[in-house]
Regions:
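Basic, Lys/Arg- and aromatic-enriched nucleic-acid-binding interface segment
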Residues: 10-41
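Conserved tyrosine-mediated DNA breakage-rejoining catalytic core shared by Y-recombinases
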Residues: 46-74, 78-83
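C-terminal catalytic core of Y-nucleophile DNA break-rejoin enzymes
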Residues: 69-88, 100-125
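Catalytic-site neighborhood detector that most strongly recognizes the C-terminal catalytic loop/helix
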Residues: 68, 173-198
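Active-site-proximal segment of tyrosine recombinases
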Residues: 43-44, 146, 156, 164-175
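Short basic/aromatic active-site micro-motif
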Residues: 135-162
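A short, basic/aromatic helix-end/turn motif that makes direct DNA contacts
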Residues: 46-53, 170-176, 185-186
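DNA breakage-rejoining catalytic core of tyrosine-based enzymes
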Residues: 1-14, 73-82, 97-98
Length: 202
């Protein structure tokens, strides 16, 4: 399987969000949370109401501390205003679910989160409806690789474009080199070239 890509265009992000919002607040929050906190999908899907909201008011927390499934390391991430608003919408639309309820609740079983495969289909189908992903009549991919890892890579790509240092992103992603991080967040040679061509100082 080819490596998935970040979503580089902010208009596409808005269009993806609109499609997912039309489906459910769950799907919209999955997307918005994923592109704003940079967690792996395995860590996103295990989140419960008690992880994202305050015990006394059920208002969104300012930050969350989790143990990453892959690394077993403790990770602290902060919740910005856009994500907080989505959490509030989610709580309202879902009649204030209990604290032990999974945020990304499956319709199958009792209090079970959606699977990675379900999350992939949610994101990939939205991308396909926008023409980002195209398949032939046999269902094989023609172009576009969008999946759950796209969310994390989109966070990294736009953080870098907005001035976050490469060293900080390396730390956030637990990478061992700058080259690894640049490749991971989808900074291509063509984009590196643009940096120089757009620099016309003096």
């Amino acid at each position: 399987m080819k490596s998935v890509e970040p979503i580089r265009d902010t208009k596409t992000i808005k269009n993806m969000r609109a499609i997912l919002k039309s489906q459910s607040t769950r799907n919209e929050l999955l997307f918005i949370l994923g592109i704003n906190v940079g967690l792996r999908i395995s860590d996103i899907l295990k989140l419960k109401v008690k992880d994202l909201t305050k015990l006394n008011t059920k208002a969104p927390k300012d930050y969350v501390i989790i143990t990453e499934i892959k690394t077993r390391k403790t990770k602290k991430f902060y919740i910005g205003d856009i994500v907080k608003k989505e959490i509030e919408n989610y709580m309202k639309e879902n009649d204030n679910p209990g604290f032990d309820t999974y945020i990304f609740l499956s319709r199958k079983g009792i209090n079970m989160p959606i699977t990675r495969q379900q999350a992939y289909r949610i994101i990939n189908n939205a991308a396909e409806s926008l023409g980002i992903v195209e398949r032939n009549d046999q269902g094989n991919l023609i172009h576009g690789e969008i999946g759950t890892h796209t969310l994390r890579k989109t966070f990294g790509y736009h953080s870098f474009q907005n001035g976050t240092s490469l060293e900080l992103l390396m730390d956030l992603f637990n990478h061992s080199s700058k080259t690894q991080t640049l490749r991971y967040i989808g900074i291509t040679e063509e984009q590196k070239k643009d940096v120089y061509l757009k620099s016309n100082l003096g």
